[in-house]
Amino acid sequence: MEFDTIAAISTALGEGAIAIVRVSGDDAIEKVDRIFKGKDLTQVSSHTIHYGHIVDLDTNQVIEEVMVSIMRAPRTFTRENIVEINCHGGLVSVNKVLQLILAQGVRLAEPGEFTKRAFLNGRIDLSQAEAVMDLIRAKTDRAMNVAINQMEGRLSKLIGHLRQEILETLAHIEVNIDYPEYDDVEEMTHNILIEKATHVRAEIAKILETSKQGKILREGISTAIIGRPNVGKSSLLNSLVQEKKAIVTDIAGTTRDVIEEYVNVRGVPLKLIDTAGIRETEDIVERIGVERSKEMMSQADLVLIVVNYSEALTNEDEDLFRAVQGKDFIVIVNKTDLPQEIDMERVTDLAVGNRVITTSLIEEQGIDELEKAIADLFFEGTIDSADMTYVSNARHIGLLTQAGRTINDAIEAIENGVPIDMVQIDLTRAWEILGEITGDTVHESLIDQLFSQFCLGK
């Protein structure tokens, strides 16, 4: 496949030590060499770095002092010639370098175009390309490991094996249909076909078993901290974040808006939402905050209910317990450093089997137990993201689910005595659906849509 030469700034814009301009294309080296004062880049070896200066050809003025990396096709990310120019960080100089490159007839890259070329040139498949963005967005070590595993092609290999098994079954059916007179070909009986289809269905189900944990690692858990005013919600947020993000006072109703913060709890990414204290109020601004708190509570994956150890449960407390029934929630009984007034038996009854953790946030007690409870709630035992293949992408999960249903339709058809050549249609469809995960059978418009979500320069 032949493409034009593209360039973009690959590092985040702003002040910093280093900024990188990436150029990819058959004549990338020649284009950069025109504005580079130093060694003749067209003659240097691949995968080498060279010191020099970028020069404005119109004024012969030195624009930047740079280090230039030369990588020759096909041993590059895009399988094209790649040049990476390491400039000083900042807005003016790096943009000037980019402008000088574009002036040589190079096109500004679209978002994700470098990774798209890696896919179109066969270096990576679609699932590996999507893992690149997952790695960039990873918020925990576990999420990073899952993304790296997918980038290395672990999911691709699993999908490839399944597609190959379906393809061999389809070929076997085809031989039986077209050449029934061949005695040396094993007859594709209904029993053999059910056995093969059942195995594929089981393998798909096995992959999908990791989807809940995979999605959590990729997207995080939306976690709402709720409770009456002044029970310690903001203190809980600050303790989990290990930084003062929310105002903590003895004045009820201090938090009037929703505060969001990402935090890594034992490898589990939480999107923490500290809500306004829920109570009846005449204050218009506070009332708006209370309504938003209830909305966030209904949308959250996990709810942390905070109650006060030094106060008896109120009707408002009990209403909160009723409101979260059917959701994952943990009860935090805070302020155990003060005399007990709360009925712990009643709290346990209202928790209906969910974990109850006692804390004294002012004395930093109970946070470790809470973090363990959160991790245990979503990950039974230990999660080994280094050795397992987790499916975390919603697109992949949807396609695997669809393929599993199609295989199930094929099995039901076989059991109902449908002719094998009709069953072949369902198996072929399942093979095509699985191919959409790796990009083997995906439509071009979907490819464009997926890569448009990438950042510029990647």
Swiss-Prot record:
Binding site for Mg(2+): S234, T255
MF term (GO), any: GTPase activity
EC primary class: hydrolase
Localisation: Cytoplasm
Keyword annotations of the record: Cytoplasm, GTP-binding, Hydrolase, Magnesium, Metal-binding, Nucleotide-binding, Potassium, tRNA processing
Cofactors: K(+)
UniProt superkingdom: Bacteria
Entry note: cofactor: Binds 1 potassium ion per subunit.
Pfam families: MMR_HSR1, MnmE_helical, TrmE_N
Main location per the UniProt record: cytoplasm
An annotated GO cellular component: cytosol
Annotated (6S)-5-formyl-5,6,7,8-tetrahydrofolate binding sites: R22, E84, R123, K458
Its EC number(s): 3.6.-.-
InterPro entries, per database record: G_TrmE (IPR031168), GTP-bd (IPR006073), GTP-bd_TrmE_N (IPR018948), GTPase_MnmE (IPR004520), MnmE_dom2 (IPR027368), MnmE_helical (IPR025867), P-loop_NTPase (IPR027417), Small_GTP-bd (IPR005225)
BP-aspect Gene Ontology terms: tRNA methylation; tRNA wobble uridine modification
Binding positions (K(+)): N230, T249, I251, T254
Location of the TrmE-type G domain: 220-379
Residues noted as binding GTP in the record, renumbered to the chain: 230-235, 249-255, 274-277
Chain's role: Exhibits a very high intrinsic GTPase hydrolysis rate. Involved in the addition of a carboxymethylaminomethyl (cmnm) group at the wobble position (U34) of certain tRNAs, forming tRNA-cmnm(5)s(2)U34.
HAMAP family from the UniProt entry: GTPase_MnmE (MF_00379)
Family indicated by similarity: Belongs to the TRAFAC class TrmE-Era-EngA-EngB-Septin-like GTPase superfamily. TrmE GTPase family.
Protein name per the record: tRNA modification GTPase MnmE
